[in-house]
Amino acid sequence: MTQQKQTQSYLVPFIIMVVLMALVGLITNLNGQFQAPMQAAFLQKSGSLTNALTTLITFAFFSGYLAMGIPSAKCIEKKGYKKTLIIGLFGLIAAFGLYELSAYIFETVDLEKFQAEVADPNAVIIPVAYYVFLLAGFVAGSAMTFLQAVLNPYIVACDVKGTTGVTRQSIAGTANSTMATIAPMLVASVIFAGKSGLDIALSSLYIPFLVLIVLVGGLIVALMNIHLPSIASAEKKEGEVLEKSVWSFSHLALGVVAIFMYVGVEVCIGNNINLYGQSLGFKPEQAALMATIYWSLMLVGRLCGSFLSSISASKQLLITSTGAGVLVLASIVTNNPYFLVGAGLFHSVMWGAIFSLAIDKLGKYTSAGSGALMMGIVGGAILPLVQ
């Protein structure tokens, strides 16, 4: 009876963790899908720097992971998982506020000057609102680092009757992929209603981000008033010294490299295929559909991956990496972007496989190892910029 009560008591925390995983998928993809409309709104008069400045939107977001990878691990060690999670959520609220501030500055300060100069072919203008938007992306990425460092351990620890750790990770991963799939069409068709260029009204950002602020605020209140399971086995005990560097674990170091490449390629395809589609003459809604198909295939792969528990993580990684590599090569040879879209089916399984292999048997080094892995996500900033 005691065990039953304990199991039932973690149902609500588990639901909150699933909602947070869905939020991570939504915000990560929202930021990336903002590239095309923000290019149209902010960077029409940025000259030859247009594409580079556009990819800086993604660069700023994923740079937060590099900057906060180690601090998030230290925060877990000093304050614990729950407080680290709440700190990340407050950071997310700050980011949402900055996104809204960017829209407000553009509408009230930049737009009049922008419209006056848009007809001048020699004018080069980068609005102040663009820099605020970059700052918002960096703060959002930093907040995501704190969230992702603690969410997976909590999902495993939140026992729910009739589930296993793998089952719960699959449920949370499905929620994450579902919201990531929705994000491209949400940006193109709902928030900006298919508009482009100066027809885009950045005031359209106000209500969506206000809703997100209220949602995250509600989650913070809920987390402050519920009991979460202990994850002490993966933490360094108070006063305990880590005898060696976390980088001395070769499988963790390789995991960081793998995460760097995995996230970099995922973002290169998932975010930039929208811009690529528009450069080929696709309408914004059509280009967004291409991105949506990519993320939809990731969702399908995630669902299929839940049935692969009998296959070792190393074999899963080998098979999916090979499959994705073949599709990328096919796209290069044929110049067909739809082969890139198909790579999403394989990408979906890689994160869990890499994470499992990288933190295997780290023990008290697990939180530090998780922070190191979060630094690898900076691949999502660097590879798209190089691309």
Residue ranges of each PLM-predicted region?
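Helix-to-loop junctions at the C-terminal end of transmembrane segments
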Residues: A67-Y81, I191, G301-A313
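Helix-loop-helix hairpin linking two adjacent transmembrane segments in secondary transporters
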Residues: G165-H227
